[in-house]
């Protein structure tokens, strides 16, 4: 297994969990409704889109009653969790595959929810931590790192300063383009020497690990609106 195996080869028509569509449909993970709640009933394509987008944007920018440290504590408690030989078996993949969000991203990217069970899971890990802590409206949820980052950018919570609890997006090429994102995790701290300490899923040999990364590999940061 290659180091930092973050993008798996998928057969044509399968979920593009790491290579997915470029449609900015991912605002759906900011919904105020409880986890896995159904989207509003259709009231007409244009009106539904307007209402849903407005509600999602408001939710994504509403402060949650969760601190950055609480999110990092839950993420840290997962260190050592490992995938199986098929690239699956984690609770993060199992949770995502059965979530309402999986149905939404399947509609966007194609495939079937069961394909998430063995798909690249770094973004699913971040999403799971958000769900477990009650910070999901701020952390977002997706299986595709590029769309996850676009959601932060669309909600004006995207920047270049590392902060504890921020969601950090990487490109191994050093690109600063969201389209080139390969990986995602949480910032633990800025080390002040051109590196950041992080907690990431699906890194190394498919594990949750604490890492130190050069900021030259960072595309940008998503900023959840945590409780102070």
What residues fall within each predicted segment?
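N-terminal capping segments
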Residues: 47-131
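...with weaker cross-activation on analogous glycine-rich loops/strands in unrelated enzymes
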Residues: 136-204
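Generic detector of well-ordered alpha-helical segments enriched in charged/polar residues
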Residues: 69-76, 149-153, 219
């Amino acid at each position: 297994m290659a180091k930092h195996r973050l993008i798996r080869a998928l057969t044509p028509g399968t979920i593009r969990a790491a290579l997915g569509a470029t449609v900015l449909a991912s605002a759906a993970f900011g919904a105020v409704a409880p986890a896995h709640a159904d989207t509003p009933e259709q009231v007409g394509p244009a009106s539904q889109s307007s209402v849903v987008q407005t509600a999602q944007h408001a939710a994504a920018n509403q402060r949650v009653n969760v601190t950055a440290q609480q999110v990092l504590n839950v993420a840290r408690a997962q260190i050592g969790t490992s995938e199986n030989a098929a690239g699956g078996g984690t609770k993060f993949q199992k949770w995502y595959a059965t979530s309402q969000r999986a149905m939404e991203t399947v509609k966007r990217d194609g495939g079937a929810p069961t394909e998430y069970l063995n798909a690249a899971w770094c973004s699913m890990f971040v999403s799971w931590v958000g769900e477990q802590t009650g910070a999901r409206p701020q952390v977002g949820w997706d299986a595709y790192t590029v769309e996850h980052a676009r959601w932060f950018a669309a909600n004006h919570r995207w920047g270049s300063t590392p902060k504890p609890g921020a969601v950090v997006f990487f490109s191994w090429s050093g690109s600063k383009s969201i389209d080139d994102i390969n990986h995602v995790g949480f910032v633990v701290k800025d080390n002040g020497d051109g590196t950041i300490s992080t907690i990431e899923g699906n890194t190394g040999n498919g594990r949750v690990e604490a890492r130190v990364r050069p900021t030259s590999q960072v595309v940008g940061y998503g900023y959840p609106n945590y409780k102070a």
